[in-house]
Amino acid sequence: MDPKNLTVEQLAAELTKLQMENSHLKRKLRRSVGGPPKEPPKPRELTEPERQLVLARWHNRFSSRSSELLRRQLDKLTATLVTEEDIDEVLKNADFRLHFRPDPSENPEKKLSKEKRRTARGQQQ
């Protein structure tokens, strides 16, 4: 069928037929994949021991990172000092402020989204 020779009514009928076929194929695909898309489950509330474990894990991340930053600052402050008295004098009067964020490479959600983007990019090519 050449679309140039069809009337508007015939084109509308053809469009309707194709849309119905498309929706039928979508339903068929959904059934073969396991039904309509489901909402992700809501996160459940943590019990107190589970909450403490999650907080302890974050505390370990922060404390290891902060101790590394503190060691670097101490090395900078005491790089030129050679006697124990000089080091004690400088560190006694020092004011430390450590600013940092958790390492984004440790965030599994971001890793997952990057992997999804890579696979999507691979499928497009």
Swiss-Prot record:
Q: Where is the composition biased (Basic and acidic residues)?
A: 39-50, 96-112
Disordered, as annotated region: 22-50, 96-125
The record's Pfam families line, in alphabetical order, gives: Herpes_BLRF2
**Keywords recorded for this protein, A-Z:** Coiled coil
Q: Which residues form a coiled coil?
A: 5-33
Q: Spell out the Basic residues composition-biased ranges.
A: 113-125
Q: Which family does it belong to?
A: Belongs to the herpesviridae BLRF2 family.
Q: What is this protein called?
A: Uncharacterized gene 52 protein
The protein's gene is named 52
